[in-house]
Amino acid sequence: MGKRILIVDDAAFMRMMIKDSLNKYRYHVLGEAENGAKGVEKYNELKPDLVLMDITMPELDGIQALKKIKSMDASATVIMCSAMGQQAMVIESIQAGAKDFIVKPFQADRVLEAVKKVVG
C-alpha cells in the first residue's frame, strides 16, 4: 500500500484531478475535504501520511488549517497548493510548517514531484 494522502480543496474538479494523478502512481487517497475546517476534522480522523491543501477556501483557509493541524501534530506533513503564488503566501505557508508549495495551475508531474520529495 502506498502513502496515504488527504486532499483538501474547495474545488471538486481539482480534488478529482489530483486524486487521479496520485492513484496512477500507487499513492492512496484516503480522504477529501472541501474546506479547511473539514480538512482538520479529516486529518484527526484519518491520520494521513500527507495532506495536499489549497489556501483559499471557505470557513477556514488553508494556512489557518495548516496551523491547527501542526498544533495538534507537529510531525504532520503538508504541501500547500494555490493559485495565489505571491511570495508572502509561500513564506507564510513554509513558516507555518508546510513542506512545499505548488502554484496552480500545475501539471500532474509537479504534484507527483512534490509528493515524492516529501514522502517518497
Question: Which residue stretches match the model-derived regions?
Answer:
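C-terminal output helix
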Residues: 106-115
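Receiver (REC) domain active-site loop signature in two-component systems and cognate sites
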Residues: 57
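Active-site beta3 strand of CheY-like receiver
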Residues: 46-52
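Acidic catalytic/metal-coordinating carboxylates
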Residues: 35-38, 61-64
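Short, conserved "switch-loop" micro-motifs in signal-transduction and mechanochemical regulators
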Residues: 84-85
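Two-component/phosphorelay signaling modules centered on CheY-like receiver
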Residues: 12-31
